[in-house]
């Protein structure tokens, strides 16, 4: 079965002041009116699984207006394991941790696999092979912690 999100907590993240969501072991559906924070919730989950936001914001844009810092954290459970992942945003930067130990964004993928599909992703079909390769590379980064280093080495080799 692997790990699954048990709970998600957002504090001063985007438009959300303080929210704790308990996820169902089967399926969780986010329902609400416009501007209720559904997309912000999906963005927070993606940050904790991929190590970055699909919106590509600056760290300051992640912090709720009027707040000094933001926190996104999740408890992942499954296979007899519990893993806590967290991202604190403050002073213009993001700090990730797993089970209370600081780590870097590239270390986050692989803890819990996720795939995000937005209406903008329809361009995968339209934009050609390079766009599809970029998307596959994103999946590779989540599946294997060393994949980012491998891609960087490949890019350097191709340049020379």
What are these regions (language model features)?
Residues 1-47:
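Pre-Walker A-like glycine/lysine-rich segment at the N-terminus of P-loop NTPase domains
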Residues 16, 21, 82-85, 108, ...:
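Weak global preference for isoleucine
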Residues 46-147:
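Nucleotide-state sensing region of NTPase/ATPase domains
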Residues 134, 156-159:
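Generic structural signal for well-ordered, non-membrane alpha-helices
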Residues 143-150, 154-157:
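Amphipathic alpha-helical coiled-coil segments
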